[in-house]
Amino acid sequence: MENTRRSFLKKVSAAGIGAAGLAMAGNAGATTTAAEPQKKKTAGKDDGKLRFGFIGTGSRCHEHINNVLAIPGNKIVAICDIQQGPIDSTLKHIAKFNVPAPKVYKGGEREFENMLNNEEFDCVIIASPWEWHVPMSVAAMKAGVPYVGVEVSAANTLEECWDLVNVSEATGSHLNIMENVCYRRDCMAALNMVRQGLFGEILHGGCGYEHDLREVKFNDGTHYNYVPGSGDLRMGPTAFAEAQWRTNHSVHRNGDIYPTHGIGPIAHCMDINRGNRFLSLSAMATQSRGLHKFIVDNGGENHPLAKVNFNLGDIVTSMIKCSNGQTIIVTHDTNSPRPYSLGFRVQGTEGLWMNDGDHVYVQGKSKPHRWDDSDEWFKKYDHKLWASLESQAAEAGHGGMDYIMMYDLIDAIRNKKPAPMDCYDAAAWSAISGLSEMSIARGGALVDFPDFTRGQWIHRQPQFAL
């Protein structure tokens, strides 16, 4: 098992090194035809319960399990991981619900393929390290799983983005990107205000991922976060959880490597892939200082990791132009000391919402040149999903948005509806990573967004959270 884990982590590291090199248009010219999943599966086979599988059994998997089992009519058929520790933790977690234990697939790094080929699922959730999101999603769709939920970001390169689109179209399987921030209560209220015209014609959006992850990117191999004062800083195979693989991206890549928390809600406000699309992007990055400084400050100048050259700029800024004229600024900032923010801004001809400061201004309704507290507006324009599910979501992760997201996906599965956030959303949002890397490598040059819908965006209608 240990050899398998080390082999896996070595491949993760190699994938990180090659990520920027793979950021190319890939299959942009490929065409596919829609088809039904090659394995016909009935939602709620036999006992009427939806059959779920999980690939990757870390902490994010536990959050999803909580919500799958909190919503009536679901069961967990199988789980898969290459490490025994997370498997044991997940089995213990599931046992708290007094439900049958799932079948366990473990051992080799391709064991997930055996799980997909041996079991029948209504949905498989993928919560693995980033490098495995696309291979596992593709395998699940090709195995005929009707709905595949992939954690964020869905893909690391443009080639991978095209893989998700092409395979979803070819197999008929519904790929859903599990972007929980799209279900954040304030984001859904703001979307409601946009759709009701409170902000007028939308002109501009701002968003990002501004989250101090220094204590996540390094730890002592036992604790999820770095233990202050310990001086025990590790990354890679000897570290624990995300520090085993995530920090490697900061070594070998320079771009917005985690864009979807921010861009997802803004994309919905601008009807991206549904009457509008991203046209082009330009990105720039600051110098890389934060991670090295964190190592020296906590481990000393002679710490082995002080010799690591981190490529990721501390702050990466991308500007996107949309076909309907809007602009969007996306910021990635995970290596700096700072409070958490996703920096949302939705601005139109009649007003705007600013997440930082909790501000709303609506022309003709707000006092001139004075901000309103966003709470008073968001209570009035609370989205119906939140209004109806508030009590159920109250105890769920991330303030309840995880529950709302899973509820919406399960509703789609039961009613055989399209995925709430489909393969085109997954590709367009995730493509910011590869495109920003390309742009930065070219000195901030403007790069074109692929049209992952191949022209369908012109006629597609909004479907999210209607």
From Swiss-Prot:
Predicted to be exported by the Tat system. The position of the signal peptide cleavage has not been experimentally proven. Binds 1 NAD(+) per subunit. The NAD(+) cannot dissociate. The keyword Ion transport does not apply. Substrate binds at residues 209, 246, 258-261, 340. Keywords: Glycosidase, Hydrolase, NAD, Signal. Its cofactor is NAD(+). Belongs to the Gfo/Idh/MocA family. Glycosyl hydrolase 109 subfamily. Glycosidase. This is Glycosyl hydrolase family 109 protein. It comes from Parabacteroides distasonis (strain ATCC 8503 / DSM 20701 / CIP 104284 / JCM 5825 / NCTC 11152).
